[in-house]
Structures are given as C-alpha cells and as structure tokens.
C-alpha cells in the first residue's frame, strides 16, 4: 500500500488564503478528511502526511486535531517560528504529540530569498535534531542556490525538498534547476518529494512526457532511497484529478523493480518521518 507524503487540509478563508488566486477557483473551498479519505481508498493509499499551510501555531492545533480523529493521517508537518527566542521551548512543547514529525516554513514566499541562511533562522534549524524533527524545504528554483549551503551546515539534520523545488515545467526550463538540484542532492541528508508537478506544468494542456526530463534528473540525483511520492492534495485540482496526477508517477516507475517502487511509494516516507 502507498503512503501519500504530502497533502493539505483547510477551512477556506479569502483573507488567510489570498494565495489562492481567481484562476485557482477550483480550490476556493474547504478541504477536510471526509473529502480526501474516499480518494485515498479509491487509489490504494493507506496513509498520509498532513503538511501546514498557514504559518501559525493555530494551524498546528487544527492539524493535530484532525490527525487524532483520522487514523489515515500518519504524520503532521507543522509550523513554528524558527527565528523566535523561545524556539527550543516550542519544540519541546510539540513532543507530546506523537504525530508531529517535522516543521516547514514557506520560504518560497519570503522577500528575502536567502532567509534560510540568516543566523536566527539557522539557529532554529539547529534545534530540530535534538527533538528528532525533520524539515520540509518549500522553495522556488531561484532559492536552490542558497539551499546547498543551508543543508551543508546541518549534515545530521534530515531535510526534504517539496515539489522538486518547483521547476518551470510549463516552459520546459531545466538547465539551471538541474545544476542546482544535483548540487543539493549530493548531501545525503536531503530527500526529495516527487509531488506537485502538475501545478508547475501547463494546467490545461500538460502531457505525461512533459514530466519525464525532470523525473529523470531527480531520480538520478537522489537515487531511489531518497525520493518519495506526494500528491499535494488539493492544490493539484487546478490541473488534474488524483488519478491523472498519480498516473504520471505510476507510468514512470512501472519499469522500476518492485523494491524500488516500494521505496518510492512507501518505505522512504516511513523511514524519513518515522511513521
């Protein structure tokens, strides 16, 4: 059975979710476990990892409550203010929740593109290992050049890059992204989520072959031990159904060995997040 390593839930609020633009109207509504669980069952998915959207500790409360009520949610990636003076105290607080596995900051939205390298931010990252937490790196491709230095500073900290670092699949731009993500992948404490690809493609005219060059790069760079499958529910709905989105990776990995497929669809996410 497969585990979906990346999805979201929210109670839609136009002010809080201003990033959901007019052209993304398909996701301008509430998305909750009752909406997602039937989709998982239809697609042979046995569990999932719920990832933060809002950058508040209220978001953690919301996610942890859903995880407590829904057994299919095997882990939660929350948010804390990594630059706060009391960061260690906040990390200690969340240890009481067995399903809290790691944290994420929406670096892709920061005006300071190199925020990850700022001393206060790095101080927060430095504390994660003590409590056994992972860190999800959410960035755009222009930030990959800082990411190599960032992950090199914490060789014992587990990181995972979300959504292949969002290459421009629509315009088939690959060269600079390829060079940068290969450099990051040299650090063996870094994994990559093969997730969210359709949202970086031409939403209305994408073809499966659009994704192959990017998948080739990531699989070769990270190997089959450091990649994991994620859907990015419900964001992919702007461009595909779950079945259409998953068929991209099902088709691509169909020629891989059973063991390699098992790693990608299940084992790696369990090992990474200690599910």
How should each PLM-predicted stretch be described?
Residues 37, 64-65, 92, 148-149, ...:
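Active-site phosphate/pyrophosphate- and oxyanion-stabilizing loops and adjacent acidic/basic residues
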Residues 115-228:
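Catalytic pocket-lining loop regions of alpha/beta-barrel enzymes
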Residues 1-3, 21, 25-47, 217, ...:
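Mid-to-C-terminal alpha-helical segments outside catalytic/metal-binding sites
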Residues 58-73, 155, 160-161, 212-220, ...:
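Short, electropositive alpha-helical surface patch
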Residues 9-10, 166, 235:
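Short active-site segment of divalent metal-dependent hydrolases/proteases
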Residues 40, 67-68, 95, 151-152, ...:
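N-terminal cationic-hydrophobic initiation segments that often serve targeting/anchoring roles
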Residues 232:
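Active-site glycine-centered loops adjacent to acidic/histidine catalytic or metal-binding residues
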Residues 1-131, 142, 175, 248-249:
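Mid-domain alpha/beta scaffold segments of enzyme catalytic cores
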